[in-house]
């Protein structure tokens, strides 16, 4: 976690999940993987296992301890909705966001179909919360446009797009 993020559009990052698997061309030059792999094998480092998927339940309560309101990028070093993260764990992460409602949370995923489906079911309680923003990554037409469709079909109150890395013209949508 960092509560002094160098990412210009957020104040803090919160990573209750670490690591990810590649699912599309937008993952090829992943900054998070490059960063994490530098520390593979360093005992005691948060990324001693590189970019291998790891749940970090000891990080769950972190936003509750931050008393000053922040814009929080959730899982800057992972994707909360990747297939190997259990629904129950995702719900636990979102429950913390519901509780620590003085922050604004930015959730960004390439697994838009799962996010949409969970927002209609197990995360329905959080879909309309104004302090949780639900977003998708868009890198090309093949993957990005369907993610936009999934986001539009979700009940999310606040939606956003991250159009990076933009690998081709995606046209008008």
Where are these regions (language model features)?
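N-terminal [4Fe-4S]-dependent radical SAM core
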Residues: 1-72, 79
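Conserved AdoMet/S-adenosylmethionine-binding subsite of the radical SAM
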Residues: 55-173
């Amino acid at each position: 976690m960092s509560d002094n993020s160098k990412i210009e559009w957020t104040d803090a990052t919160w990573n209750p999940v670490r690591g990810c698997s590649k699912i599309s061309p937008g993952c090829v030059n992943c900054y998070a993987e490059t960063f994490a792999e530098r520390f593979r094998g360093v005992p005691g480092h948060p990324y001693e296992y590189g970019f291998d998927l790891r749940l970090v339940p000891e990080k769950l309560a972190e936003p509750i301890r931050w008393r000053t309101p922040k814009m929080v990028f959730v899982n800057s070093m992972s994707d909360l909705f990747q297939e190997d993260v259990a629904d129950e764990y995702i719900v636990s992460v979102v429950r913390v966001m519901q509780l620590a409602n003085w922050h604004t949370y930015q959730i960004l995923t390439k697994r838009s179909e799962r996010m949409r489906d969970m927002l209609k079911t197990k995360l329905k309680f959080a879909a309309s919360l104004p302090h949780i923003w639900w977003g998708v990554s868009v890198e090309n037409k093949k993957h990005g446009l369907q993610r936009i469709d999934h986001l539009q079909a979700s009940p999310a109150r606040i939606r956003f797009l991250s159009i990076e890395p933009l690998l081709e013209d995606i046209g008008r949508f």
